[in-house]
Amino acid sequence: MTEYDSPWKEALDRYFQSFLALCFRELHDAVDWSVPPRMLDKELQRIAPQNDVGLRTVDKLVEVCLLSGGTEWLLIHLEVQSQPATAFAKRMFVYYYRIIDKYDRPLVSLAVLGDEEQNWRPNRFERESYGCRIDFAFPTVKLLDYLSQIEELEQSENPFATVILAHLMTRQTAGNPLDRCQWKLRLLRPMYARGMSAEDVRSLFRVLDWMMELPTDIAIEFERELLKIEQENQMPYVTSIERRAAEQGLEQGLEQGLEQGLIVGQIELLQRLLGHVETSREDLLGVPLDQLAQQRDQLQGELETTRKND
């Protein structure tokens, strides 16, 4: 699975009910949500075609209980590649019959198309030869269609609306990191205003951060604005300093001890945010852990004071 696919997997795992409510409402309303869905990804991996390895897809197999009293397996095949795949409908059919053949369970196949080709809308696989016919139809949702519903998505309380917006704006701002930065902040602000739980904010932030990647110089400006948002709302949910520090200090953390590596990364980022001359990484790694923590705390206090005076 590629880096771009990872946020989709996390979003579907955490917000599966919200996903169905937004994208496949009829099916959502037939599910008994008092019974938690079961993620069956391991079962799906056992029957996945070998030639699917490396494709930019996210596949989910989920068991849900229905209000009618039965159970249903849902195959969700999410296509996130930028170009249409000519064999997509066939792949949907192959997954369908492999699951039916191995598990013999009621099954619904759903497709989410994340490409940018307006006219590419596969929803059927057909084959016919001398009176023998296959006609396999499956529901699809085209994320591109939501471009006409940006305002509605921004106002929606459904967390998956933010995921779709992040996907759309990532593609709309390709090659324009400043616009992407503004959209990223625009999507983050309502999370605090709506009083979302800290866990939900962190989860959605990870999805946005994965999708809406920024170059280093603009990422630093993004961090500045994010700190302001956190301070204004008195809700430091994202802990952005620690998040970026984890990225910057991971290598050192593995070699020198995770805690030391993370603190070094925090100090480096704080020095940049404050405009200080940066201490070399080699020098920082030679400082005892307790002194590093003290230096980090002093810089954090200086940054907070600076923000209050702005």
Question: Which role fits each region the language model picked out?
Answer:
Residues M1-D310:
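Elongated, amphipathic alpha-helical interaction scaffolds
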